[in-house]
Amino acid sequence: MGVLFDEIAEHGTPTTVHLDRPFDLGDDRRKFGVADLAELVQELAGWLAAAGAGHRDRVAIVKENHWDYDLLSCAAVRIGAVPAKLSDRLPSNTVEALLKRLDPKVLVTTAAVLEHARAAGIDLASFAGTTLVLDGAVPGTLSLDDVRGHTAPGPRRRHDDEPLAVMHTSGTTGTPKLVVHSRNTIIGQLARFETVRYPVIGMRGDDTLVNASAYAHGRTFCWTASAFCLAPREIVVISQQDADRADPVLRAHPPTVMEAPPATYVRFAQLTERLDNPFRRTRLFVSTYDAMHPPTIRSYLTASHRKRPLWMQGWGQSETGPLTFRFHTRSSVDPKHSGRTSRNVGYAVPVKTRLRVVDPDSFEPVPRGRPGLVLAKTAARCLDYVGETDRWQAKHWGGWWITGDLGVRNRDGSVDLLDREVDMVPGLSCLRVEDILEERLPQVLECVVLGQPGKAPLPVVVTVDGELDNASWLRATHDILPLQAPIALTWDQIPRTGTGKVRRLALLQEITATDETHGTGRWT
């Protein structure tokens, strides 16, 4: 990854990158060729070396969302260091806990991140050997003026099984884990698999690929390697979840292939209803991180003017990469198909992944059609958790990885995802109920069903204004098992992870003052 752009530039790859806003690197450009990116990564490597980073040192990166997270990571890899991307959307005390585990030689951040933490009584710079601030001068830290012009040492190779990068899990159930991947696991097993030009879904030379991700997530590090190897004509990077800000960028560069996490698709869905919507040329939508609700998928497939647009849904984890995949068409999410949801996350990735569903207590395999704990076996499994090796080891059983998800293996081999074990409600799939409610309540942006011991499930609905019509709610829930009265909130009132996923335990605690659930949380 340290010489990725150098090698691609040598092949004369004509890909052009367009940004929705400049990088947070003191550079006002919004357009880059591959050779420009190679030069930028070399320059960043010089900055990190000047800040004191070297072979096997950890470099923590905490900043506002943008793809420069991955360019800084490539620069760290180039000098033999190990980058660790941390989302600035994490609470400051969580960032503090992660930095203590990492013990980084260098922290790369911004003045706003430091000030936000300082307001909470936390000095993030105190947890790193040196802190490099990208956008100004902060006492006790280095600024860009202190490191510019430093020549980095030549690229340093490492063994394929040595730590290459650290990325954190979503943290939906508490403090995220720090996942360690090697070149073999994240590049050799994951990125290389994505560089194959598969029929129909494979990248083409005339494609415009748009990515609107959470760039602190490990997915985009892998994506960076695969996307540039496939050499589309244009790559468009969107760093903001504000649909009105994204709209002009999408209209200037209408995507033929679009990738984003579920939360971003939900936020951008309003664009599908606008005149001459920006998704009219899109032939493939890619959703990562989590399953999505059918109404959102339907809105994008309907917006495309292509004859047969596809939605590719992946389910996996930071520790393993993708475990399953499934394709949706306009027909598969047609509301006329009563009861159909997107909880079926498809089939295990061929050749790469094996899945098994077992009883959570005995770990004996359960028959097809019965719910159980989902186990996975893949060569892409991470190496460890930083500072939590015991926790990493506890998620292994007989050579299998314990995902912590509950699911059903169907007769055809596909998997229905039910719930995280920690979020489960006996006799109910919260995720399926959420699918049904979102289908019946088009004014709802998102629905979250929370389980509480001794009480009926608690539904939380997200609307634009935080209001919900009671009559509509009663009609939507007339044939669903008893639920508590719904709580309506706005999008920004919901605690979320860096990828926009709902932090269910935090939400439960905010509403009920308790985080007690039906699940054990043994495999979080």
Task: Describe the residue ranges of each PLM region.
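Conserved pre-ATP/AMP-binding loop-to-beta segment of ANL
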Residues: 13-15, 150-168, 174-175, 200-208
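Conserved AMP-binding A3 loop
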Residues: 31-35, 164-191
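Conserved AMP-binding/adenylation subdomain of ANL enzymes
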Residues: 187-208, 216-257, 271-272
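Gly/Ser/Thr-rich phosphate-binding loop
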Residues: 256-259, 271-340, 354
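Conserved C-terminal "lid"/linker of ANL adenylate-forming enzymes
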Residues: 448-450, 460, 472-524
